[in-house]
């Protein structure tokens, strides 16, 4: 808030506008220039544990900057489908926000690629297919 003022809005029960769901949330994500991944807890360091917003934000059309938590790079390609910042390094996050606020075409290309990757690989259908394949492949 100090750095970006009214251009920064925190959505959620503990945020500026409370909880938003459904179509209004789609519109917010799609119209925002940048959505920041929500793992800002600096004490958080669990590999392969990240929020569903990793998939929700690009799936709803957002350009996303997300903390580089181990395993995220297996889901999206950094710099091509989303942008990763060093977890806990708020200077790195600010630098990337400032860069992408002034590079519209690059930001839009990454946003679109992230949306397509999500629709291709990160839907509930693909998750259920993976679960069922794993269960049936490992049947005793």
Task: Show the residue positions of the predicted features.
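Two-component system phosphotransfer/interaction surface
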Residues: 90-102, 128-136
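A charged, aromatic-enriched C-terminal amphipathic alpha-helix characteristic of glycosyltransferases
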Residues: 105-133
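Short, contiguous hydrophobic alpha-helices characteristic of membrane insertion segments
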Residues: 64-67, 81-88, 131-140
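Short, hydrophobic/aromatic alpha-helical segments in well-folded domains
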Residues: 24, 53, 96, 113-114
């Amino acid at each position: 808030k100090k750095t970006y003022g009214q251009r920064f809005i925190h959505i959620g029960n503990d945020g500026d506008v409370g909880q938003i769901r459904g179509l209004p949330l789609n519109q917010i994500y799609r119209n925002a220039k940048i959505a920041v991944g929500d793992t800002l807890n600096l004490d958080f360091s669990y590999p392969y544990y990240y929020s569903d917003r990793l998939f929700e934000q690009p799936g709803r059309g957002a350009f996303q900057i997300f903390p580089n938590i181990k395993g995220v790079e297996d889901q999206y390609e950094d710099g091509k489908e989303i942008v990763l910042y060093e977890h806990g390094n708020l200077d790195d996050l600010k630098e990337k926000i400032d860069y992408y606020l002034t590079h519209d075409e690059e930001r839009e290309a990454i946003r679109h690629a992230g949306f397509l990757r999500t629709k291709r690989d990160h839907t509930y259908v693909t998750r259920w297919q993976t679960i069922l394949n794993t269960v049936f492949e490992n049947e005793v």
